[in-house]
C-alpha cells in the first residue's frame, strides 16, 4: 500500500541530506566563531554535587543490599521473588500514602518545617473552580482529569462558547498522551473505560495467535476508532500545526500508523510544518506502512527529505528512530546504518547508548550471524570505552543487556570484561534500566563466566555479584555446578547448596537432582563423604510433607538412589536402608548400581544379614542382576548353611518368575 504522503521520487542514498546538514553545521560553526566567550565568574554546582563526590569515595559493598531496603537482616530480600515483593510493597505503601494525602488534603495541613518546604505539603488534586468556563477547563486539564475535561469541553461548545485554540490544544495533548484513557495513577478509573478496554482486548486476543510477541502499542492500548481525540480535532474551528502534530504522535504511540500518515498528508495539504518530534514518530511508524525492505527505506528517506524542505533540523532521537526502523529492513540495513552514523557525526550530534543498541540490532541478528558482522561490538567498545553517558533516549537502558547477549552468543569473555568495565565507569551503572534488565545483564555475564573462566575467577565474581547485584535463577546455579564439576571442585557443593536454599531454588527438581548426582557420582574421602551425607539428609527433608511447606518435591528413582548411596558411603547404613525401603512405598525401582553399592558397603561392614536382605529386595523388584547378586553373596560372604539355602531358594524363585514372564510375553506375541 502506498504511503498517503507526497512522493518525491526514488532515492539512492542520503548524500543530499548529508550535504545539506553538513552545510548547516558549518554555517553554525562559522557564526559561533564570531561570538564572544563569556567566562562565568563563579562555578555553579549541582545541588547533589557534595553527595556525588562522597559517593565516589566509597566502593561497592558486595554484602550490602539495595539502598531502597532497610538495613535489617529480616527486611533484606534473599531471593529475586522477595526482591520484587519487598520493592512492590514499599512502592505500594508510598502510593497508598499519596492517595490518602491527595484524597484528604485538609487533614495534613500542619506545617512544622522552617522555612516552608512546599514539596512536603499535600497537593490539591480537587477542582476549585465551579461552573462551566474555560478557566475550569484549564484547571481540569492541569489536574489530568480526562473525562471531566472532555465533558466540560462539550458543555462549552453546547453553550456557544468555543474554547481558545491554546486551551483546545492542551486538551488534545492530554487525550493523545494517555490514548483517551484515564491516567493510571488514578485509583478510581472510569468503569465505562474499563469495560470498553476489556471488550476491545477480548476482540484483539481472539485474533492473536498463541505465543505471538506483543507490540508496544498492544501493551499501552490501541488507538480506538473515532475516539475523543479525533472527535475534538474534527470539531475545532481552527487548527494549527500543533493540533496536527499532537494527533499524529498520539496515533503513532498507540499503533495507528495508517491514520497517522493520513493526518500528516492533511497537515501538508494545509501548508503547515511538522515539528521534529512528529517526524521522529512518523519515521518509527514508516516500516509498518510497507512490506518490502527497500520500500520501507524509501519512505524513511522521503520523510527526511520533507524535513529538509521544511527546514526542520534533526536531533538525536531522529537518527535513533531511523536506526530503530532499519532493524526491520533486513540485511540491506547494515550499510544504511553506517551512513546514518556518519550523518550524525557530520551534524556534531553525539550518539547515545540507544544509538549503539540499535546499531547492534541491525548488525547482529543471532548466534548464527557471520563472525565479520558480529565484530561491530568490538568497534563500538573501541569508540566509547572509558566514557561517561547520561540518559538521552529511553532506549539507552537496553544497550548493556543486549551487548552482553552478543558477548554470550559469541562466547567472548574479553569483550564481556570490556563491556562490564564501561558499565562501571562513572555513573554508567545508572543506565542499566529496571530490575529485570539488570538481572538479565548479570545473568548473561555470570553464564559466560561459568563457561569460559576457571573456578577461582568464577567464585570471585560469584561473591561480588551475589546477592547484592544479582539473584541467580536455577539456570545460573546449574551453570555454577557444571563449572565446579569441570574444575573438580565438588568439595564446594555443600556450601553452594546452602546458597541455593537461601536464594529460594531448593524447590527446583532439576537443580536438586543435579546436586545429588554430582555428589553420588564418585567416591570421595571420608570427611567430604560425611559432608555430602549431611547435605543429602537436608535435601531429603524437602521431599517430606511438613507444616507451612506449600511445595513438596516428588521422589524419583534417581533422587532416592543417590541419597541412599550417599548415606551408605558415609557409613550410615541404617538410614540408607530406610531410604532403600522408600522405593517400594513410592512405587519406584532401584537401579542395579544402587544395589551393588549397598552390597559393597555390606561387605566392608561384614554384614551378611544386610547382603541377604538386599537379595530379597532385588527379588521383590525383579531386578535382572538378582542371580549374580546371590552368587556374589555366597562367594564373598561367610554364609551359614541355612543362609545358603535361603539364597538358593531366592535364586530359584527369581528364575521361575523370570521364565513365567518370558512365556507370557511369547504367548502374547
Swiss-Prot record:
Residues 1-13 form a transit peptide. Keywords: Mitochondrion, Repeat, Ribonucleoprotein, Ribosomal protein, RNA-binding, rRNA-binding, Transit peptide, Translation regulation. Its main location: mitochondrion. Signal peptide: none annotated. One of its GO terms (molecular function) is ribosomal small subunit binding. It comes from the Eukaryota. InterPro entries: Pentatricopeptide_rpt (IPR002885), PTCD3 (IPR037387), Rib_mS39_PPR (IPR055063), TPR-like_helical_dom_sf (IPR011990). Residues 653-663 have a biased composition (Low complexity). Belongs to the mitochondrion-specific ribosomal protein mS39 family. This is Small ribosomal subunit protein mS39.
Amino acid at each position: 500500500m502506498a504511503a498517503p504522503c507526497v512522493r518525491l521520487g526514488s532515492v539512492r542514498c542520503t548524500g543530499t541530506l548529508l550535504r545539506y546538514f553538513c552545510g548547516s553545521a558549518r554555517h553554525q560553526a562559522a557564526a559561533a566563531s564570531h561570538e564572544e566567550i563569556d567566562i562565568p565568574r563563579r562555578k555553579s554546582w549541582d545541588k547533589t554535587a557534595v553527595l556525588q563526590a562522597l559517593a565516589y569515595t566509597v566502593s561497592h559493598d558486595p554484602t550490602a543490599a539495595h539502598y531502597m531496603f532497610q538495613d535489617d537482616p529480616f527486611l533484606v530480600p534473599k531471593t529475586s521473588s522477595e526482591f520484587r515483593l519487598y520493592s512492590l510493597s514499599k512502592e505500594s505503601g508510598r502510593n497508598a500514602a499519596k492517595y490518602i494525602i491527595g484524597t484528604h488534603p485538609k487533614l495534613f495541613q500542619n506545617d512544622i518545617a522552617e522555612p516552608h518546604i512546599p514539596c512536603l505539603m499535600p497537593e490539591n488534586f480537587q477542582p476549585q473552580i465551579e461552573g462551566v468556563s474555560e478557566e475550569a477547563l484549564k484547571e481540569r486539564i492541569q489536574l489530568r482529569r480526562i473525562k471531566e475535561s472532555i465533558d466540560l469541553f462539550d458543555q462549552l461548545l453546547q453553550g456557544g462558547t468555543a474554547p481558545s485554540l491554546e486551551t483546545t490544544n492542551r486538551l488534545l495533548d492530554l487525550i493523545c498522551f494517555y490514548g483517551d484513557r484515564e491516567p493510571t495513577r488514578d485509583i478510581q478509573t472510569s468503569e465505562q473505560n474499563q469495560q470498553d478496554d476489556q471488550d476491545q482486548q477480548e476482540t484483539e486476543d481472539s485474533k492473536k495467535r498463541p505465543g505471538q510477541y506483543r507490540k508496544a502499542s498492544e501493551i499501552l492500548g490501541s488507538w480506538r476508532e473515532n475516539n475523543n481525540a479525533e472527535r475534538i480535532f474534527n470539531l475545532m474551528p481552527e487548527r494549527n500545526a500543533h493540533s496536527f502534530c499532537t494527533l499524529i504522535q498520539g496515533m503513532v504511540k498507540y499503533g495507528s500508523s495508517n491514520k497517522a500518515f493520513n493526518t500528516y498528508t492533511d497537515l501538508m495539504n494545509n501548508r503547515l510544518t511538522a515539528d521534529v518530534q512528529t517526524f521522529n514518530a512518523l519515521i518509527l511508524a514508516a516500516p509498518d506502512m510497507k512490506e518490502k525492505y527497500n520500500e520501507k527505506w524509501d519512505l524513511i528517506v522521503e520523510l527526511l527529505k520533507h524535513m529538509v524542505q521544511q527546514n526542520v533540523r534533526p536531533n538525536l532521537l531522529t537518527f535513533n528512530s531511523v536506526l530503530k526502523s532499519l532493524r526491520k529492513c533486513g540485511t540491506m540495513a547494515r550499510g544504511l546504518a553506517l551512513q546514518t552514523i556518519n550523518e550524525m557525526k557530520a551534524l556534531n550530534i553525539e550518539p547515545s547508548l540507544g544509538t549503539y543498541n540499535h546499531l547492534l540490532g541491525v548488525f547482529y541478528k543471532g548466534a548464527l550471524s557471520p563472525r565479520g558482522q558480529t565484530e561491530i561490538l568490538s568497534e563500538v567498545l573501541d569508540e566509547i570505552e572509558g566514557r561517561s553517558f547520561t540518559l538521552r533516549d529511553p532506549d539507552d537502558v537496553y544497550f548493556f543487556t543486549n551487548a552482553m547477549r552478543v558477548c554470550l552468543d559469541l562466547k567472548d569473555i574479553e569483550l564481556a570484561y570490556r563491556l562490564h568495565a564501561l558499565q562501571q565507569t562513572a555513573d554508567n551503572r545508572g543506565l542499566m534500566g529496571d530490575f529485570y534488565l539488570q538481572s538479565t545483564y548479570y545473568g548473561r555475564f555470570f553464564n559466560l563466566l561459568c563457561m569460559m573462566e576457571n573456578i577461582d575467577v568464577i567464585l570471585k565474581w560469584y561473591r561480588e555479584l551475589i546477592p547484592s547485584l544479582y539473584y541467580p535463577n536455577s539456570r545460573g546455579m546449574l551453570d555454577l555446578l557444571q563449572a565446579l564439576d569441570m574444575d573438580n571442585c565438588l568439595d564446594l557443593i555443600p556450601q553452594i547448596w546452602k546458597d541455593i536454599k537461601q536464594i529460594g531454588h531448593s524447590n527446583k527438581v532439576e537443580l536438586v537432582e543435579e546436586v545429588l548426582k554430582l555428589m553420588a557420582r564418585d567416591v570421595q574421602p571420608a570427611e567430604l563423604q560425611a559432608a555430602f551425607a549431611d547435605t543429602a539428609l537436608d535435601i531429603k527433608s524437602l521431599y517430606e510433607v511438613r507444616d507451612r511447606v506449600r511445595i513438596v518435591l516428588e521422589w524419583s528413582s534417581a533422587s532416592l538412589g543417590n541419597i541412599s548411596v550417599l548415606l551408605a558411603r558415609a557409613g550410615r547404613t541404617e538410614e540408607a536402608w530406610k531410604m532403600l525401603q522408600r522405593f517400594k512405598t513410592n512405587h519406584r525401582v532401584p537401579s542395579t548400581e544402587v544395589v551393588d553399592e549397598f552390597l559393597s558397603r555390606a561387605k566392608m561392614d561384614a554384614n551378611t544379614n544386610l547382603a541377604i536382605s538386599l537379595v530379597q529386595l532385588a527379588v521383590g523388584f525383579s531386578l535382572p542382576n538378582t542371580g549374580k547378586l546371590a552368587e556374589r553373596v555366597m562367594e564373598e560372604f561367610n554364609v551359614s548353611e541355612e543362609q545358603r539355602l535361603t539364597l538358593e531358594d531366592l535364586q530359584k524363585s527369581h528364575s521361575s518368575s523370570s521364565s513365567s514372564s518370558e512365556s507370557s510375553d511369547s504367548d502374547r506375541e
